[in-house]
């Protein structure tokens, strides 16, 4: 190589600067964040007076676990909005908050107990609540530092927490509005129930996953028609929940469906249908149903049509009718009637009804005034059959780990033994699961506390409607601006079709339903619920100082009722509120009550993902309209 190599760098007129070649962000970013904290950047931005305010109300994340990418996206989007409004000259307020009560935290504490061989039900409730509070406090601190590391500007030294004493007081006060305005009631209806967590769940606490389920085609014997052609024929139902068969009380058919009577004239081996057996089926589904029983089209024939008049004469026997050692559990005649929810798109054209485990069936017999005849209480809170149920007592629908229990197998085996099955199989379908335990849920009839969404609200505030539903729908159209506009349609359709709000949960970590019921009265009696402003005021005063723990302390009932009514005449309710009621009440204890909330108690913006149309948007709308 020649010694005369040209140094081209020396021939260039390069600018010189004191700026470092690399930004050094890993080192510099923490320094900037520390500087912002030292000077109190959020409060300094508030110092300028007489500016138009802008309030973004933060939907609270759950105080459980470290941040994930969804948290980051959510908070960064909010930070962009707040900073933009600030740079446009507004007083842009952002108070971060956390959802601190509820099942996910209880579940973590119970996991700790299980590892130690400790039974949660044997732990004093105040001790359990203390552990839940400490767990939530720990995760609030961790998540706060993680959010600050993302550079999010907000009131981090004084966020809102749903477990703060003042927050719990306000949540109780908001609940008392429902108590006093007549929309709160105790009812018994099928709700989504988690046997693993032993509590009712809201729709927003459920997620859908594929699940493989047992599926059975079951025969009900026809009696009482006086028609030799129909008597002793079998009506066939199809279900993916064999565990509901012991609770069957009826079968329903469709008023507009064409039905026929089909006779078996041949059969293969290992077939549960017998030659000469006759089945009533929807014509559109008959070939498929009989095919499930391994009968090809040469092995059965259609004898005749079965008219609506014919169906109206039919009575049915449960497949376990008269079974030995059944103790008469299934020996009464099963109701048989038309229902508008029956179709012939799948199944058999008939639907088996266990009104304790299906909302449509429950509503059908409620409207008929026949609930007392059809409601059963066969399934306990842990998903096991009551101990004295013949054949199936103590059998579990689900194991404690959420896997398939032994109930379905035992029922299928018994139905096979008595000749009650036409066919069986398995099906993979979308099925509701608890979002926390990931275990399947069931529908179970239990006494719960509800907010009636269609009952007139007795508060004299009818500008936007008389009922919670009417007010919510009017507010969606007249008081809220939607971006994108499709968000309006999503929430409107959900609220338009939703049932009454299940407020109660059978858990311990949350704000209790601060109410009392009168001994000897029925839920339908006017005096069943104690509605007393002086009692309510005592409760709220205690919650402000001691938090919701005051409800669980010894002598609480006498403390709140003594000198006003006779404590011995009332029972204290210990269910806790749905955590969505907690977060739905944040407008009251953040926007309304805090000096740095908003002047009019309203937010300029709620910014969340579309999942909150059935979550926080939904509960905030319902709660504020009650």
Residues covered by each model-derived region:
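Histidine-rich, glycine-flanked metal-binding segment
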Residues: 22-52, 290-296, 305-306
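Acidic, glycine-rich active-site loops and adjacent beta-strand->loop/helix elements
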Residues: 60, 98-102, 383
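Protease-associated
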Residues: 250, 257-350, 359, 363
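Conserved active-site neighborhood of enzyme catalytic/cofactor-binding cores
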Residues: 62-96, 107, 111-114, 192-197, ...
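Residue patterns forming the tRNA-binding/recognition surfaces of aminoacyl-tRNA synthetases
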Residues: 2-18, 22-25, 31, 35-39, ...
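Short secondary-structure junctions
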Residues: 42-44, 297-305, 315-318, 420-426, ...
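Hydrophobic or amphipathic alpha-helical targeting/insertion segments
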Residues: 93-95, 100-103, 174-180
């Amino acid at each position: 190589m020649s010694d005369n190599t040209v140094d081209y760098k020396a021939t260039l007129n390069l600018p010189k600067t004191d700026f470092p070649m690399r930004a050094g962000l890993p080192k510099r970013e923490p320094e900037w964040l520390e500087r912002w904290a030292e000077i109190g950047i959020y409060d300094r931005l508030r110092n300028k007076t007489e500016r138009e305010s802008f309030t973004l109300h933060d939907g609270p994340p759950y105080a459980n676990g470290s941040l994930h990418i969804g948290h980051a996206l959510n908070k960064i989007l909010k930070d962009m909005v707040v900073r933009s409004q600030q740079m446009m000259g507004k007083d842009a307020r952002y108070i971060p908050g956390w959802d601190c009560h509820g099942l996910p935290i209880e579940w973590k504490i119970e996991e700790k107990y299980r590892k130690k061989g400790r039974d949660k039900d044997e732990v004093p409730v105040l001790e359990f609540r203390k552990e839940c509070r400490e767990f939530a406090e720990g995760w609030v601190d961790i998540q706060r530092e993680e959010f600050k590391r993302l550079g999010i500007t907000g009131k981090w030294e004084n966020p809102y927490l749903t477990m703060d004493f003042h927050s719990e007081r306000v949540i109780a006060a908001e609940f008392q509005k429902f108590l006093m305005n007549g929309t709160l009631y105790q009812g018994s209806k099928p709700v989504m129930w988690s046997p693993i967590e032993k509590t009712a769940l809201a729709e927003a606490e459920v997620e859908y996953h594929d699940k493989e389920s047992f599926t059975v085609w079951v025969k009900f014997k026809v009696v009482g028609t006086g028609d030799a052609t129909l008597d002793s024929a079998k009506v066939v139902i199809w279900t993916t929940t064999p565990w509901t068969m012991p609770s069957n009380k009826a079968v329903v058919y469709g008023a507009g469906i064409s039905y026929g009577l089909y006779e078996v004239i041949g059969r293969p081996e290992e077939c549960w249908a017998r030659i000469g057996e006759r089945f009533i089926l929807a014509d559109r589904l008959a070939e498929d149903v009989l095919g499930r029983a391994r009968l090809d089209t040469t092995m059965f024939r259609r004898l005749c049509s079965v008219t609506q008049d014919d169906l109206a004469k039919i009575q049915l026997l449960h497949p376990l009718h008269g079974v030995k050692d059944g103790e008469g559990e299934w020996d009464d005649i099963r109701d048989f009637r038309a229902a508008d929810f029956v179709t012939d798109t799948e199944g058999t054209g008939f639907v088996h009804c266990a009104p304790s485990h299906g909302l449509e069936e429950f509503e059908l017999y409620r409207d008929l005034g026949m609930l007392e005849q059809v409601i059963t209480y066969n399934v306990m809170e842990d998903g096991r059959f009551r101990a004295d149920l013949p054949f199936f007592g103590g059998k579990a629908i689900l194991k404690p780990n959420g896997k398939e229990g032994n109930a379905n197998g035992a029922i299928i085996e018994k139905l096979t033994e008595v000749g009650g099955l036409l066919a069986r199989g398995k099906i993979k379908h979308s099925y509701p699961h608890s979002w926390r335990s990931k275990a399947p849920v069931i529908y179970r009839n239990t006494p719960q506390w509800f907010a009636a969404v269609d009952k007139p609200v007795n508060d004299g505030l009818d500008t936007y409607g008389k009922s919670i539903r009417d007010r919510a729908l009017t507010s969606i159209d007249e008081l809220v601006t939607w971006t994108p506009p499709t968000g309006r349609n999503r929430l409107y359709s959900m609220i338009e079709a939703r049932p009454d709000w299940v407020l109660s949960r059978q858990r311990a970590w949350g704000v209790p339903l601060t109410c009392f019921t009168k001994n000897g009265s029925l839920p339908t009696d006017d005096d069943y619920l104690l509605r007393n402003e002086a009692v309510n005021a005592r409760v709220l005063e205690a919650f402000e100082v001691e938090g919701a723990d005051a409800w669980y302390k010894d002598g609480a009932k006498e403390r709140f009722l003594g000198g006003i009514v006779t404590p011995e005449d009332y029972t204290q309710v210990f269910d806790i509120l749905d955590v969505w009621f907690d977060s739905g009440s944040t407008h009251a204890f953040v926007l309304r009550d805090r000096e740095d909330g908003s002047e009019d108690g309203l937010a300029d913006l709620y910014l969340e993902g579309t999942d909150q149309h059935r979550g926080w948007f939904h509960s905030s709308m319902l709660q504020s309209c009650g």
